[in-house]
């Protein structure tokens, strides 16, 4: 019984020490938590910025740079102190070069952090539109089989020429190598080459795919297969229509390719690729297999540059075979009011819906094109080809 007080005293001392240890350890636990990252949120990496995204100043474009950083850190953007509001920061920066790297640096008790993004300045931007027609093969087969005296005896090309004469419209026709009934491009004669050449200022031909089927032919295919098919079609275009008529591809069938194919495409002259960048139940689709962040950004913006390949990606604004005639203007009008969509109109449709024998033939398809081109023309948009300059604009 004599050692009982001692044991009680030791117990109390031990308990106090343990409790003290917990209290003393608390600050260490807090300090070990990861600090908030420093990140530039606007502009987005790869953003294509034009006059609508900032203020035009002498030889430059003044933009806002926004982001987040640890609360007490000092933040600089390209060497200039940023204004802090809570964990946010904002700074102004003048773009003076075609490409600019933006560097945000934060320094504080947790050390130094930085985040970098690169943006592209569309210095000579102007309102412009590109008209692309996918899945072309029927008109080539029609001309080859009927042996017309002129290319424009084919109603399809005649319609496009009338739109050109009326509005100065330009078109790029994305073509297949073969049709399902066995027609192939080598069967198309070269006797129309002079007409193709004379029309090459407003009418171009480009590779789309080897054939319409199977669907998504390049989504899982190696780059070598895509490039081989591209080369076959390009060779034939140059043979029967001349190099003046050839355009590097701007839309790959289904808008899905392996990331490893982008650099080889760029080496074949591809400067721009268009897609839908649309959200579906399984994720993002017709997006060239971009990651979620870039796909989401492109769903809300005109364009984004992939610096690794050098290709600029464009979001298709409207698909006319899916848009009723009375919905064309209501679809275009809000785009023209949105600074992220207003500068460049990427207009799009598919050839097969013009042909009466096609199961889903659209009788007013030509009227839809006329309504759209009339609207963009009346609102000051100029026709361009995306493979020329920066999305058809001067560089």
Residue map of PLM features:
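C-terminal domain-boundary segment and adjacent tail
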Residues: 272-277, 347-395
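Metal-dependent polysaccharide deacetylase catalytic core of the NodB/CE4 family, i.e.
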Residues: 170-258, 280-282, 347-355
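Secretory targeting signals
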Residues: 1-6, 19
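N-terminal export signals
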Residues: 10-30
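Active-site beta->alpha N-cap acidic-glycine motif
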Residues: 116-197, 347
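Active-site-adjacent pocket scaffolds in enzyme catalytic domains
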Residues: 181-185, 244-245, 254-347
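C-terminal segment of N-terminal export signals and the immediately downstream linker at the start
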Residues: 26-43
């Amino acid at each position: 019984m004599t050692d009982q007080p001692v044991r009680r005293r030791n117990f109390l001392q031990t308990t106090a020490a343990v409790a003290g240890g917990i209290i003393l350890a608390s600050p260490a636990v807090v300090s070990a938590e990861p600090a908030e990252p420093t990140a530039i949120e606007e502009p987005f990496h790869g953003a294509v910025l034009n006059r609508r995204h900032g203020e035009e100043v002498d030889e430059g474009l003044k933009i806002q740079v926004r982001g987040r950083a640890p609360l007490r850190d000092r933040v600089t953007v390209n060497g200039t102190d940023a204004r802090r509001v809570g964990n946010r920061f904002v700074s102004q920066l003048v773009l003076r070069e075609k490409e600019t790297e933006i560097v945000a640096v934060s320094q504080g008790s947790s050390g130094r952090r930085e985040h970098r993004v690169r943006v592209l300045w569309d210095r000579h931007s102007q309102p412009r539109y590109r008209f692309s027609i996918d899945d072309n093969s029927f008109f080539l087969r029609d001309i080859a089989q009927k042996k017309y005296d002129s290319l424009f005896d084919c109603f399809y090309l005649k319609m496009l020429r009338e739109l050109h004469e009326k509005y100065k419209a330009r078109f790029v026709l994305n073509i297949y190598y073969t049709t399902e009934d066995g027609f192939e491009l080598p069967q198309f004669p070269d006797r129309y080459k002079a007409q193709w050449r004379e029309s090459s200022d407003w009418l171009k031909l480009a590779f789309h795919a080897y054939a319409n089927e199977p669907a998504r032919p390049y989504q899982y295919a190696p780059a070598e297969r895509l490039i081989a098919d591209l080369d076959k079609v390009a060779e034939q275009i140059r043979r029967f229509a001349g190099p003046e008529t050839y355009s590097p591809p701007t839309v790959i069938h289904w808008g899905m390719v392996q990331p490893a194919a982008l650099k080889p495409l760029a080496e074949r002259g591809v400067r721009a690729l268009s897609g839908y960048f649309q959200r579906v139940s399984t994720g993002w689709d017709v997006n060239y297999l971009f990651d979620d962040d870039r796909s989401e950004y492109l769903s809300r913006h005109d364009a984004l540059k992939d610096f690794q390949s050098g290709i600029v990606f464009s979001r298709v604004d409207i698909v006319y075979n899916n848009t009723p005639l009375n919905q064309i203007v209501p679809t275009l009008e809000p785009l023209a009011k949105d600074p992220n969509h207003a500068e460049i109109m990427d207009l799009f449709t598919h050839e097969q819906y013009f042909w009466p024998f096609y199961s889903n033939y659209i009788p007013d398809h030509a009227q839809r094109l006329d309504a759209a081109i009339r609207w963009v023309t009346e609102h000051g948009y100029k026709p361009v080809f995306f493979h020329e300059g920066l999305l058809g604009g001067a560089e």
